[in-house]
Protein backbone atom coordinates (compact mmCIF):
# COMPACT_ATOMS: atom_id res chain seq x y z
CA UNK A 1 0.00 0.00 0.00
CA UNK A 2 2.82 2.41 0.85
CA UNK A 3 4.47 1.73 -2.51
CA UNK A 4 1.32 2.65 -4.47
CA UNK A 5 0.89 5.86 -2.42
CA UNK A 6 4.48 6.84 -3.24
CA UNK A 7 3.87 6.18 -6.95
CA UNK A 8 0.67 8.26 -6.92
CA UNK A 9 2.46 11.10 -5.10
CA UNK A 10 5.32 10.98 -7.62
CA UNK A 11 2.93 11.01 -10.60
CA UNK A 12 0.99 13.94 -9.13
CA UNK A 13 4.21 15.91 -8.53
CA UNK A 14 5.40 15.14 -12.08
CA UNK A 15 2.04 16.29 -13.49
CA UNK A 16 2.18 19.57 -11.54
CA UNK A 17 5.76 20.18 -12.66
CA UNK A 18 4.88 19.41 -16.30
CA UNK A 19 1.87 21.75 -16.17
CA UNK A 20 4.02 24.55 -14.76
CA UNK A 21 6.47 24.35 -17.66
CA UNK A 22 3.83 23.91 -20.35
CA UNK A 23 1.71 26.92 -19.35
CA UNK A 24 1.28 29.36 -22.24
CA UNK A 25 3.37 32.49 -22.00
CA UNK A 26 1.25 35.63 -21.85
CA UNK A 27 2.50 38.50 -23.99
CA UNK A 28 1.84 41.96 -22.61
CA UNK A 29 -0.86 43.67 -24.64
CA UNK A 30 0.29 46.61 -26.67
CA UNK A 31 -1.11 49.86 -25.28
CA UNK A 32 -3.09 52.00 -27.71
CA UNK A 33 -3.26 55.79 -27.65
CA UNK A 34 -6.18 57.67 -29.17
CA UNK A 35 -5.98 60.58 -31.58
CA UNK A 36 -8.75 62.35 -33.51
CA UNK A 37 -8.80 61.32 -37.16
CA UNK A 38 -7.00 63.69 -39.47
CA UNK A 39 -8.95 62.55 -42.54
CA UNK A 40 -12.53 62.38 -41.17
CA UNK A 41 -14.74 65.42 -41.64
CA UNK A 42 -18.03 66.13 -39.92
CA UNK A 43 -19.95 64.30 -37.22
CA UNK A 44 -19.13 60.61 -36.88
CA UNK A 45 -22.23 58.41 -37.05
CA UNK A 46 -20.81 55.18 -38.46
CA UNK A 47 -18.13 53.49 -36.34
CA UNK A 48 -17.42 50.86 -39.01
CA UNK A 49 -16.66 53.52 -41.63
CA UNK A 50 -14.52 55.38 -39.09
CA UNK A 51 -12.62 52.18 -38.27
CA UNK A 52 -11.98 51.44 -41.95
CA UNK A 53 -10.79 54.98 -42.63
CA UNK A 54 -8.46 54.97 -39.61
CA UNK A 55 -6.95 51.62 -40.61
CA UNK A 56 -6.73 52.17 -44.38
CA UNK A 57 -5.89 55.87 -44.65
CA UNK A 58 -4.08 56.62 -41.40
CA UNK A 59 -2.40 53.30 -40.57
CA UNK A 60 -4.10 52.99 -37.17
CA UNK A 61 -4.84 49.71 -35.40
CA UNK A 62 -8.50 50.59 -34.75
CA UNK A 63 -11.01 53.41 -34.95
CA UNK A 64 -14.44 54.27 -33.58
CA UNK A 65 -16.92 57.10 -33.14
CA UNK A 66 -16.61 58.60 -29.65
CA UNK A 67 -18.43 61.50 -28.07
CA UNK A 68 -16.06 64.41 -27.63
CA UNK A 69 -17.86 67.61 -26.67
CA UNK A 70 -19.80 68.94 -28.55
CA UNK A 71 -20.29 66.03 -31.02
CA UNK A 72 -19.30 62.49 -31.99
CA UNK A 73 -15.85 62.39 -33.60
CA UNK A 74 -13.88 59.69 -35.38
CA UNK A 75 -11.08 58.62 -33.05
CA UNK A 76 -8.15 56.52 -34.30
CA UNK A 77 -6.11 54.24 -32.02
CA UNK A 78 -2.36 53.96 -32.58
CA UNK A 79 0.35 52.06 -30.66
CA UNK A 80 1.77 54.38 -28.00
Curated annotation (Swiss-Prot):
A cellular component term, taken from the record's GO annotations: secretory vesicle
Coiled coil: none
Organism whose genome encodes this protein: Arabidopsis thaliana (Mouse-ear cress)
Record-given protein name: Defensin-like protein 14
Signal sequence extent: 1-29
Disulfide bonds: 33-80, 44-65, 50-74, 54-76
Record's keyword terms, sorted: Antimicrobial, Disulfide bond, Fungicide, Plant defense, Pyrrolidone carboxylic acid, Secreted, Signal
Protein function: Confers broad-spectrum resistance to pathogens. Has antifungal activity in vitro.
Entry superkingdom: Eukaryota
GO biological process, one term: defense response
Homology family: Belongs to the DEFL family.
PTM sites of type Pyrrolidone carboxylic acid: 30
PANTHER family with a match to the protein in the record: DEFENSIN-LIKE PROTEIN 1, DEFENSIN-LIKE PROTEIN 14-RELATED
InterPro entries found in the cross-reference section: Defensin_plant, Scorpion_toxin-like, Scorpion_toxin-like_sf
Compartments where found: Secreted
Keyword Secreted (UniProt): yes
Secreted listed as a keyword: yes
Amino acid sequence: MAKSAAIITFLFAALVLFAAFEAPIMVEAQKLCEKPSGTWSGVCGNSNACKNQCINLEGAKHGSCNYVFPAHKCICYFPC
